[in-house]
């Protein structure tokens, strides 16, 4: 319809010109001009339908989405362990990591430590919080370089690993801060690779969506990456067992408004992954 309207207008305008000018001199040029003009207008109209407009932002999303009252920084570690070494790896982690957590000279807290049950096998996941942001992280790293027990632990650990990676994260302002909880629980870490430029939209939608997922106290924490793999979001949930997880997730679909928020957040995702994790005995999150 729009294309036919544009062509009709172009033809009428061109016809008026032809009546006032010599047909031999103007006709070829007018045909070329009206054809290219119509195509460009039609292309512009079509682009307006399919190209999503992104509003300009006046601040970094880390400032817009993170908690203002704290300067906490989180480190998420993924360690892929040799299958035959997992038991020994867990043993040395449970001996050394709690000592760092309990030492008041280290401005950091071990939030949780797990083995992946479903997902990447023979994997350990550790979540640390640094009270004071990047300066606290630097202070801890410098002190650990002088900690002989930790250096021995790191050397022994390196012989047990196949690979490892980490990310530095900030917490969403609308999520609970992770606090120790009693068990037994299983934990789900849902990780989302977002499309670049969509973090603000994700935060806006989930600021409303989180209220649908707090009835069972299952929401542990929500984070977004600052260093490492960027535009990554991690949601951490706690459930009594897998059946409880299934029941809680199904119940959300019966709450008015949940399906609409899911509808709008799904297009923001490039890739997603779910890990079901079991806490180690020394994990503050049980």
Swiss-Prot record:
Cellular compartments per GO CC: mitochondrial matrix; mitochondrial outer membrane; mitochondrion
MF terms (GO), sorted A to Z: protein-macromolecule adaptor activity
UniProt record, GO biological process: mitochondrion organization; mitophagy; oxidative phosphorylation; positive regulation of high voltage-gated calcium channel activity
Keyword Mitochondrion: yes
InterPro entries reported for this sequence: Dimeric_a/b-barrel, NIPSNAP, NipSnap_domain
Localization: Mitochondrion matrix
The entry's keywords: Autophagy, Mitochondrion, Transit peptide
Role noted for this protein: Protein involved in mitophagy by facilitating recruitment of the autophagy machinery required for clearance of damaged mitochondria. Accumulates on the mitochondria surface in response to mitochondrial depolarization and acts as a 'eat me' signal by recruiting proteins involved in selective autophagy, such as autophagy receptors (CALCOCO2/NDP52, NBR1, SQSTM1/p62, TAX1BP1 and WDFY3/ALFY) and ATG8 family proteins (MAP1LC3A, MAP1LC3B, MAP1LC3C, GABARAP, GABARAPL1 and GABARAPL2).
Disulfide-bond pairs as recorded: none
Tissue expression per record: Widely expressed. Most abundant in heart and skeletal muscle.
Range of the transit peptide: 1-23
Self-association state and partner proteins as the record states: Interacts with CALCOCO2/NDP52, NBR1, SQSTM1/p62, TAX1BP1 and WDFY3/ALFY. Interacts with ATG8 family proteins (MAP1LC3A, MAP1LC3B, MAP1LC3C, GABARAP, GABARAPL1 and GABARAPL2). Interacts with VDAC1.
UniProt family annotation: Belongs to the NipSnap family.
Predominant location category: mitochondrion
Protein name (Swiss-Prot/TrEMBL): Protein NipSnap homolog 2
Highest taxon listed in the record's lineage: Eukaryota
Cited Pfam families: NIPSNAP
């Amino acid at each position: 319809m729009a294309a036919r309207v544009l062509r009709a207008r172009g033809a009428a305008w061109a016809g008026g010109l032809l009546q006032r000018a010599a047909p031999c001199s103007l006709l070829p040029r007018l045909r070329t001009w009206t054809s290219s003009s119509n195509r460009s207008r039609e292309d512009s109209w079509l682009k307006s339908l399919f190209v999503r407009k992104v509003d300009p932002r006046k601040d970094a999303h880390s400032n817009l989405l993170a908690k203002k009252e704290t300067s906490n920084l989180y480190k998420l570690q993924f360690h892929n362990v040799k299958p035959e070494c997992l038991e020994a790896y867990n043993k040395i982690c449970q001996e050394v990591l709690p000592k760092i957590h309990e030492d008041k000279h280290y401005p950091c807290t071990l939030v949780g430590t797990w083995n992946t049950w479903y997902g990447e096998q023979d994997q350990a996941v550790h979540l640390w919080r640094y009270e004071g942001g990047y300066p606290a992280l630097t202070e801890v790293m410098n002190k650990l370089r002088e900690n002989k027990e930790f250096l021995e632990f790191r050397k022994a650990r390196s012989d047990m690993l196949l690979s490892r990676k980490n990310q530095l994260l900030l917490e969403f302002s609308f999520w609970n801060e992770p606090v120790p909880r009693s068990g037994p629980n299983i934990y789900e870490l849902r990780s989302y690779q977002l499309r670049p430029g969509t973090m603000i939209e994700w935060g806006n939608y989930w600021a409303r969506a989180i209220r649908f997922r707090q009835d069972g106290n299952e929401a542990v924490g929500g984070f977004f990456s600052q260093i490492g793999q960027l535009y990554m979001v991690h949601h951490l949930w706690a459930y009594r067992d897998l059946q409880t997880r299934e029941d809680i997730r199904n119940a959300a679909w019966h709450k008015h408004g949940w399906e609409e928020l899911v509808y709008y957040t799904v297009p923001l995702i490039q890739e997603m992954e779910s890990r079901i994790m079991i806490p180690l005995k020394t994990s503050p999150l049980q």
